[in-house]
Amino acid sequence: MKIAISGQDWSEGSLGYKIKGILDDLGVESKILKDGDSPSAHNADIVLVAGGDRVILDHSHKVRDFSVPVLGIYESDSTGFLGQVDVSELESAVMRLKKGDYEVDEVFRLSVKVDGREVEPVLNDVALFPRKSATLLEYVLKVNHSDLWHDNSDGVIISTPIGSTAYSMSAGGPMVLQKSQVFIVVSVNSLDNTRRPLIVPNDSNLEITDILCRYLCDVVLDGGKRVTVRKKLECSKHDYPTRFVRVIKDSSAKIIEKKVKLAEELLNM
């Protein structure tokens, strides 16, 4: 078995450094991925991503075509939801990987075009907001090239099921089970009370057009990279999903339960 390791910090004592050391001690062939490296180019069977949700999302952005299965490795103080194995349990997880005792779960992504130019695919969500806060955004939402609504709001979020417990939920969107084949559209603080969160089949083509605002607007990819948009945002199902390794059989309901418990803990602080 060949394992690639993806991460952002390789200094001594870092999570990536620890993972590499554990694999070396177990005699497992491994390769550290540098920026621009493709896991498939190194004939990797599995990619271990060192870090929390942000690092896993960044790795997903870099892989635009066929995805080598990913297993997120975190440290015990992490509050993320995409990683599955604590680094303290990595040795036993590797033993299961070597025996083939795991499943691969395919999670679809959003293909995103900004003003006709394709940008990085997203795993959680894509959001459209004015660059200056507290500024009204006017736009038209189209589904399969037909106008669905004209809206004035603070912004709009388009989410996948796995992203439904992230920004979308904070803005009033529904929690959606991970294997649901849908997109979620959430208008943020619309002036029209009928602009409730919308669920559409994931074979739909979504467009945000006729964008009007006093200031420049940005498309935000998975809460990270920003791309200036002037006329149109387009979203559809990406041809290639992200493939997650599952050594622990957590259901979608368990992931939602974890999110709810975290919210309760924050409220009680």
Task: Describe the residue ranges of each PLM region.
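Short glycine-/acidic-enriched loop or helix-start segments at secondary-structure transitions
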Residues: 58-60, 81-82, 138, 167-170
